[in-house]
Regions:
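Trp/Phe/Arg-rich N-terminal binding region typifying the photolyase-homology
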Residues: 1-107, 116, 129-133, 156, ...
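Long hydrophobic alpha-helices with heptad-repeat/coiled-coil character
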Residues: 3, 137-148, 159-163, 212-239
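Structured ligand/cofactor/substrate-binding pocket environments in proteins
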Residues: 68-81, 128-183, 188-191
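Long, low-complexity intrinsically disordered regions
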Residues: 92-113, 183-185, 193-204
Length: 330
């Protein structure tokens, strides 16, 4: 999977004919890595805004109409919903980070076997290897994985979310954290997702059939309710005069940024995938993010007609001291 916008657009064009009935009928089936699938695998491009949600939804509606493409469009909107929900409740992210740090400092029994794919549960162990080797899992497999992690292996949900965030090419703070909370029963109180052997066998085409291996009657995880939503802070007014545009891994589509009236004098790029976890990010993720940033910087040079360079995190304080910097909202 090439981390460039043109590759994302090629994948988008190829999948557009499947965004209607083919997607709604086949989206739950996971044929396995390298096999033709009814899911798009566009999420790494959308997550870094190499391609935009609007482009994807517009393609679906143009090809199939909103009603026929409804299931596919809903999946795109889930990502936006998660980001908005977490932006209004930043304490949930802070609590998650604190729990991960404490959990990794003293990992519970069974954790090392789980992340090495040595649990003895065939489907789970296979998904661990697939995730590590490809940086991707089918969405249904992600739900099964999370449910087995939480309810069968009885491991903390936040350590599973951290494992995903380290390895997923589309790893996103909001989507990943809140999806794991939803499986655990923490997002919608009393509603948790339970992986069942029959369901896994059916939707993997019989590749896996973990009969008798799963806890299929668990209770939801219990934690205090999340805080009430609070308004997202207003974005500061842009400065006058020349500005430096800071691109980062959360938004690499500089062509669409609302910068009318601003004079972009240069572009700088920053990526910090290692900040996703106390254990950093997997090499696959680091390479994808670095490549995506280079692609975004290259397009920024063409769009604004200025120079662009990648900078390190420790260079930012000095840049912010001497230049007026604008950046996309994360």
């Amino acid at each position: 999977m090439l981390p460039i916008r043109s590759a994302g657009l090629t994948r988008l064009a190829a999948f557009t004919p499947l965004m209607g009935r083919a997607y709604s009928d086949g989206r739950n089936y996971d044929p396995g890595p390298g096999k033709p699938s009814s899911v798009s695998a566009l999420s790494p491009y959308i997550r870094h805004r190499l391609i935009m949600e609007q482009e994807v939804v517009a393609a679906a509606i143009a090809a199939h109409g909103a009603e026929v493409a409804d299931k596919f469009i809903q999946e795109v909107f889930w990502r936006s919903y998660w980001k908005g929900w977490l932006a209004q409740r930043p304490a949930v992210w802070d609590a998650y980070r604190a729990c991960v740090a404490a959990g990794l400092a003293a990992p519970p029994e069974g954790y090392e076997a789980a992340i090495a794919g040595r649990t003895g549960i065939g489907c789970f162990d296979a998904w661990v290897q697939e995730l590590i080797e490809t940086g991707y899992l089918h969405n249904h497999a992600r739900m099964w994985f999370a449910s087995i992690w939480i309810f069968t292996l009885r491991l903390p949900w936040f350590l599973g979310a951290d494992f995903f965030l380290r390895h997923l090419l589309d790893g996103d703070a909001a989507s990943n954290t809140l999806s794991w909370r939803w499986v655990a029963g923490l997002h919608t109180k009393g509603k948790h997702y339970v992986a069942r052997a029959e369901n896994i066998a059916r939707y993997t085409g019989g590749r896996f059939a973990p009969q008798g291996e799963l806890n299929e009657k668990p209770l939801p995880v219990q934690e205090p309710d999340p805080p009430a939503p609070r308004p997202v802070p207003n974005v500061a007014a842009p400065p006058s005069g020349p500005v430096t545009l800071l691109l980062h891994e959360d938004d690499l589509h500089p062509e669409s940024l609302p910068l009318a009236g601003l004079h972009v004098q240069r572009v700088i790029g920053l990526c910090c995938p290692g900040a996703r976890s106390p254990l950093g990010a997997a090499p696959l993720v680091q390479r994808f993010v670095a490549g995506a940033l280079e692609d975004g910087l290259g397009r920024a040079v063409q769009h604004f007609g200025v120079s662009a360079e990648r900078v390190a995190l420790d260079e930012l304080p000095e840049i912010l001291r001497r230049e007026a910097v604008v950046m996309p909202e994360a």
